[in-house]
Amino acid sequence: MRWLGIDHGDGRIGLSISDELACLAHPYQTLQSDARVLAEISRIVERERIGGIVIGLPKNMDGTLGQSASKAKAFGDELARAIPAAKIIFWDERLTTVEAQRALRAAGKNTKQSKKIIDQVAAQILLQSYLDSLQWEQRGAQ
């Protein structure tokens, strides 16, 4: 099953996508956070045959949920209504954007270049974290 990772933000939404074996996450696309975003994600889910969606839940460092997490949950609820066949998972995304910034700097990307893809890379880190947890669960069950 393929997974879609979503890094939800007020202005932009970063997307990542897994391979068909759900082993590796790849940056996919950045969308504007506007009225058309649900329809666009629905098209992507259908076109890429996505079975599950992992939405980043930006928890505070103490583990509590703040305003950004509430917005992400509300977005996930809207997405669940728009795409009822997809499994929706919320996943802790603390520090994924910081990690994405570090990775892009290490790859030699400047701030201007990074701005175009940082949300995708954050979504990739988020989704890869979830996929890794699935792999650990499967290994533990054997």
Predicted regions and their residues:
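Phosphate- and other anionic-substrate recognition elements at nucleic-acid/protein interfaces
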Residues: 2-6, 10-11, 16-142
